[in-house]
Amino acid sequence: MAIDKLALIKEVRERTNGGMIDVKKSLEESNWDVEKAIIWLKSNGKIKAAKKADRVSAEGSLAIAKNAKRAVLVEINCETDFVAKNEQFKTAVQTVANALLESQVNNNEDLNKVVINGVTLNEFIDNLTATIGEKISFRRFVSLTANENEVLGAFAHINGQIGALVKIKGQNEELARNVAMHAAAMKPEYVFVNQVPAERIEILKAEFVKPTGFENKPANIQEKILQGSLDKKLAEFVLEKQAFMIDDSLTIEKLLSTQNSQLLDAVRYTVGEGIEKVVTDFAAEVAQQMNK
């Protein structure tokens, strides 16, 4: 079976932050065995000592912890996709989510009160950084609390990259979860129309193209046509106006109304959104070195 040398070099580089030439040599000296190559790099002092605190953590994973009255969504970042898929890392992210759920902490100012396995949250993250060998960063969390006659829904994509929480009126847990699943899949920017900046609404209205005969219609009909056009545009990015992914004959707003329910709150995370990633063209770099 042929050895995928490029993939092996990429893996060792991601795990060690070693230089390209050193990584290539370590694999050659170790008969292309990744674990032996890492040992070779360590024993020969070739692993870069770049400060982890200065490196960018743009990969990572999400986790959700939930009970009947509270739900927590947390994002923790790492440097590489390799670590993001690591079971030890994913288990640690879930451990943090569970601790946040139990702590009843609702804001960043109180995070120092969270204790995990006898240490503070910051210490837990620092220990994880030391154990895994990459910069691990606690990025953010959000919690929703259900009051009387309210229910929470939660959905996390199997790859741990997308998660959503919703709160609705009533006690229909399946409905709440379906709306959370929709929010995760359809990526709304806002929950409610009244959250959309007025300037953006005006831009959408200005984009309206009058249909033939529009000027001859009564004012109330013109207003309905204009509102219909606006609602169609809002449906692209406002949760309550979006067509329900399971039954697109209903908007989320109407779906909940038919179930005597109401959308109260929602939040959606995607790992790394808003973080500028450092992109390395491993293929080009490896090809250049392999030809030397």
Feature map (PLM): residue ranges:
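N-terminal assembly/interaction segments in proteins that build large macromolecular machines
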Residues: A2-K292
